[in-house]
Amino acid sequence: MKHLHRFFSSDASGGIILIIAAILAMIMANSGATSGWYHDFLETPVQLRVGSLEINKNMLLWINDALMAVFFLLVGLEVKRELMQGSLASLRQAAFPVIAAIGGMIVPALLYLAFNYADPITREGWAIPAATDIAFALGVLALLGSRVPLVLKIFLMALAIIDDLGAIIIIALFYTNDLSMASLGVAAVAIAVLAVLNLCGVRRTGVYILVGVVLWTAVLKSGVHATLAGVIVGFFIPLKEKHGRSPAKRLEHVLHPWVAYLILPLFAFANAGVSLQGVTLDGLTSILPLGIIAGLLIGKPLGISLFCWLALRLKLAHLPEGTTYQQIMVVGILCGIGFTMSIFIASLAFGSVDPELINWAKLGILVGSISSAVIGYSWLRVRLRPSV
């Protein structure tokens, strides 16, 4: 029990559990003895009905759309705290992750197109390396425990949120044909209600969560990635203390263990089980995986580093206090972990064209993401001193 308590008290414990869950999923998805059970579990239908409203999704989508909205709620709370009171409190500091995210989307896409522009079919996958899997990127960072300055974690969160918002916009504009404007209208009303609650000084967290559920349902029905609702709710929950209590900080404290030890490991288990059937190393010589690997492994850190350097030179932004430019470069490498978000975009780009293209894309995403994780983790482990 003493060793167990020590493990869960460690800052790295959440990241370790997430990686174990991901490895277990890969083994089960590619083992003849367990692959059937694994996929049956993910395809288990779960239905929720309230009056005439019905949400009928399989287990995988409930994990990705519902549980991960809670993760994004926590991320929204943490980023808001830093924007209001912490390392991103000034306009130029807050602009830094925005500029970094823009570079981290543009350069990987251009690098991918450098390989695939001549092929009108594979060209459609240009957005694949522009995505970052925030959960796995933070999971790798968590493996370093207390070595990692909080400000660096917040910078990665802020950058990845903007990256995810960019990916959601890209999906909506280029890969979605059936957006529901009525549902988007309901979502807009829910956001307006959240704003009014905040302006009126309402401090009951439950009220925000209730409106957040309406917002999540509307965003889900609209065809846009539903996890976006979590970030929005997090930004509206009051942060200021009154009588020594802050609703945002209190909720952040409550959510953290649930996210670290249940939601993120479940997400990893549900999404890391990529079947390697039909995937061969010979495919690495094709322009599709080469473009993805180049975009994730080279384009991400290059784009983030270049745009950050330009922002500093032109005095458009400031480095977050307590960080170095070299640390920002390594965060750029970790942002090359595209994984589930990249696989999702690949399925949208090639799902109706050729299943073999999806296999090649998966190969490129796995190689690029794993390489980014290993290099980023190793570099930070060498450069960051353990806290005493």
UniProtKB/Swiss-Prot annotation:
Transmembrane segments: 12-31, 59-80, 97-116, 123-130, 155-176, 181-200, 205-222, 224-236, 254-272, 287-310, 340-350, 358-380
GO molecular function, one term: sodium:proton antiporter activity
Cellular localisation: Cell inner membrane
GO biological process, alphabetically ordered: regulation of pH
Keywords, ordered alphabetically: Antiport, Cell inner membrane, Cell membrane, Ion transport, Membrane, Sodium, Sodium transport, Transmembrane, Transmembrane helix, Transport
Chain ranges on the Periplasmic side, renumbered to this chain: 32-58, 117-122, 177-180, 223, 273-286, 351-357
Membrane topology, from the record: Multi-pass membrane protein
InterPro entries xrefs: Na/H_antiporter_dom_sf, NhaA
Highest taxon of the lineage: Bacteria
Topology feature Cytoplasmic, residues: 1-11, 81-96, 131-154, 201-204, 237-253, 311-339, 381-388
GO cellular component, one term: plasma membrane
Family: Belongs to the NhaA Na(+)/H(+) (TC 2.A.33) antiporter family.
Protein name: Na(+)/H(+) antiporter NhaA
Organism: Shigella flexneri
